[in-house]
C-alpha cells in the first residue's frame, strides 16, 4: 500500500497572474503558503482484476480508458500505469471548491503515488510540471499553475512565471519572529459557500486572451501588489502585509462580477471592525474561505462566530507533496 499527501494552500499576494493567458505575455508573480490541511491518496494492489476508483463516487472499470474521473484517467496514462489490479482512494481534510487549491493538491498527490508505485523518484518541480500538463494542457482547464507548484514544494514560497513557461521559485526569507507572528495572526473562516474556480477563472482567461485593457490593468496591479507583499514579509512588516492584503481584495473584487457578493462584503467589513487589519477571499473568489490578518484575534473570532462562520485553524506545511507510507 502507498499513501501520499499534498498540502492545501493560501495565496498571500499576486494570485491570478499564474494563468498562461497572462504570464505568456507579461510574466506572472505570486506568493503562496502551503498549510497543514491535506489531500490524501491511497494506492493498493488488489487481488481482483479491475481498477477501483473511490472519491465522491465509486468507479469499477476494466481499463484506464473507461475511467470517468478525468484527472485520474490522465495521470494513469501520463505515468504509464495500466495495471488493472489497483484500488485508488482519495480523501481530504477540507472539501473541494472552497478556494484552497484542492485540485492541484489532488493531482500532485496522485502523481506522487503513481510514481512511487512504479518506483520512480520525481523532483517537486517535475511533479508540479506534470500536474500542470494534466490539468492545463490535457484537460484544458482555465486555471493557473500556483496550486500545483505550492502543493509540490510546500513552504511559504515566491513564484515567478516566465513567458516561455519556465517557473522559478524560492522560499520567502522570514525571520523566526515574523514566521511565528504570521502563522499566529492569520485566521481562516469558512463562508459556507462552495464554487468551481473554473467559472470565475474562465472569465479572466477569456478577457486576458482578448487583451481586455481593464482585465490586464487589474492583473498588472495584482502582480505589483504581489511583489510589495513579498517585500513586506521579508522586511518583517506584517501590518503592511495586512494592508496590502486589503488593497488586493478591494482591487480583486472588482475584477469579476462573481468575485464577491453582499454577504461576503458584510462579513469582511465586520472583520475589519473587529480586530482584522486586512484580509481577502482565498482562491478565485465567490466563496470558500475568508482569511484575515488579526491584531485582536479573540475579538475577531468572537465576531465571526456570531456571524455563523466556522474557523479552521492551521499551521504552515514545509514538506510539500510526500509519501506517508509505502510497503
Predicted regions: what is each one?
Residues 1-11, 18-21, 36-82, 91, ...:
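C-terminal nucleotide
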Residues 104-118, 287-293:
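Short, small-residue alpha-helix embedded
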Residues 28, 287-288, 321:
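Glycine-centered small-residue motifs that form tight turns
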Residues 85-87:
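Residues at or immediately flanking beta-strands
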Residues 96-98:
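Helix-loop-helix module between adjacent transmembrane segments
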Amino acid at each position: 500500500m502507498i499513501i501520499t499527501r499534498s498540502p492545501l494552500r493560501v495565496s498571500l499576494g499576486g494570485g491570478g497572474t499564474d494563468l498562461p493567458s497572462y504570464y505568456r505575455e507579461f510574466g506572472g508573480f505570486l506568493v503562496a503558503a502551503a498549510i497543514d490541511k491535506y489531500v490524501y491518496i491511497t494506492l493498493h494492489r488488489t487481488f481482483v482484476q479491475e481498477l477501483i476508483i473511490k472519491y465522491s463516487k465509486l468507479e469499477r472499470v476494466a481499463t484506464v480508458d473507461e475511467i470517468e474521473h478525468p484527472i485520474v484517467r490522465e495521470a494513469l496514462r501520463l505515468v504509464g500505469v495500466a495495471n488493472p489490479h489497483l484500488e485508488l482512494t482519495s480523501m481530504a481534510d477540507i472539501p473541494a471548491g472552497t478556494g484552497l487549491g484542492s485540485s492541484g493538491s489532488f493531482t500532485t498527490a496522485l502523481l506522487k503515488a503513481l510514481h512511487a508505485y512504479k518506483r520512480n523518484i520525481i523532483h517537486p518541480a517535475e511533479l508540479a510540471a506534470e500536474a500542470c500538463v494534466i490539468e492545463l494542457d490535457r484537460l484544458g482547464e482555465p486555471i493557473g499553475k500556483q496550486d500545483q507548484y505550492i502543493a509540490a514544494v510546500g513552504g511559504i514560497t515566491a513564484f515567478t512565471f516566465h513567458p516561455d513557461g519556465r517557473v522559478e521559485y524560492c522560499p520567502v526569507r522570514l525571520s523566526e519572529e515574523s514566521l511565528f507572528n504570521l502563522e499566529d495572526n492569520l485566521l481562516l473562516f469558512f463562508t459556507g459557500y462552495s464554487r468551481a474556480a473554473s467559472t470565475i477563472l474562465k472569465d479572466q482567461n477569456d478577457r486576458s486572451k482578448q487583451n481586455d485593457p481593464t482585465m490586464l490593468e487589474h492583473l498588472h496591479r495584482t502582480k505589483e501588489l504581489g511583489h510589495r507583499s513579498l517585500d513586506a514579509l521579508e522586511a518583517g512588516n506584517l501590518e503592511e502585509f495586512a494592508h496590502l492584503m486589503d488593497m488586493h481584495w478591494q482591487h480583486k473584487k472588482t475584477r469579476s462580477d462573481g468575485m464577491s457578493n453582499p454577504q461576503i462584503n458584510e462579513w469582511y467589513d465586520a472583520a475589519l471592525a473587529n480586530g482584522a487589519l486586512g484580509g481577502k477571499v482565498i482562491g478565485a473568489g465567490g466563496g470558500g474561505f475568508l482569511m484575515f490578518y488579526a491584531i485582536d484575534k479573540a475579538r475577531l473570532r468572537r465576531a465571526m462566530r456570531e456571524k455563523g462562520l466556522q474557523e479552521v485553524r492551521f499551521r504552515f506545511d514545509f514538506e510539500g507533496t510526500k509519501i506517508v507510507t509505502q510497503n
